[in-house]
Amino acid sequence: LAIGGGSVIDTAKAIAHGLKYPQNDIWDIWTKKITLTNTTPMGSIVTLAAAGSETSDSAVLTNEQTGQKRGLSTPFNRPCFAIMNPQLTYSAPNYQKACGIADILMHTLERYFAKEQNNYLTDYIAEGLLKDVITQAPIMINEPTNYIAHSEIMYAGSLSHNDITGLGRTKDFSVHKFGHELSAKYNATHGASLTAIWSSWARYIYQKDVQRFCHLGKILFNIDTLNKTDETIALETIKYFEDFFTSLN
């Protein structure tokens, strides 16, 4: 039973796998030297809205001996149950709440800006989730016992990483991979490492799909498009995200 946030839940997943493979180094599963075919049932009680590990098929571990941080996706990673009471997240420090908010947004954005975009409903779900998180996040930070804001963010955390926001497309988790390297080397909180990378990544790739960045900016930030080029709107969208993350401290 995991009681905590994403790191605690992911650790419990690793322990559950390790119980079935006592003769092996658990890291061999994460480096795919061993194919996982079974696990021990585990559940979670969530105390931080962030990674969505309580409903996801992924788990991330850091090897402190090698300085590596790696993710593993497998159906065996999904917990048997998750108890999600927003009141259990009230006491988390604001910095951790902010990092969790960033992770939720990134889990959705890295699916939204995938190469294949073949499902409109998936887009609508992702856009609704992003808009809700951006709306509720400052309330959550400024009102530490606001039940509605905390429940919305907690719900979004699960939806952002159970793959409902990525149905019908492949995922591009390049920002997460860069973030893992930063976290492993500098012991940075996961969400913070992602915000350090995302805007540079976005400015590097936005011309691959300028229209998509424009579309998202209009929906999320009501960007005034009068007499502006698509490129200008796309870059404004990226800047709005930067300013949002900065506002969360």
For each predicted feature, which ranges?
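A glycine/threonine-rich phosphate-anchoring loop and its flanking beta-alpha core
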Residues: 20-121, 215
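Short, intrinsically disordered, charge-balanced linker/junction segments flanking boundaries
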Residues: 241-249
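Active-site segments that bind and position negatively charged phosphate/pyrophosphate groups
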Residues: 111, 115-240
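Short glycine/serine/threonine-rich phosphate/pyrophosphate-binding segments
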Residues: 7-13, 52-55, 171, 175-176, ...
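N-terminal small/polar loop signature for handling phosphorylated ligands or for N-terminal nucleophile
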Residues: 1-24, 139-150
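Alpha-helix-centered segments that form part of catalytic cores
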Residues: 84, 239-242
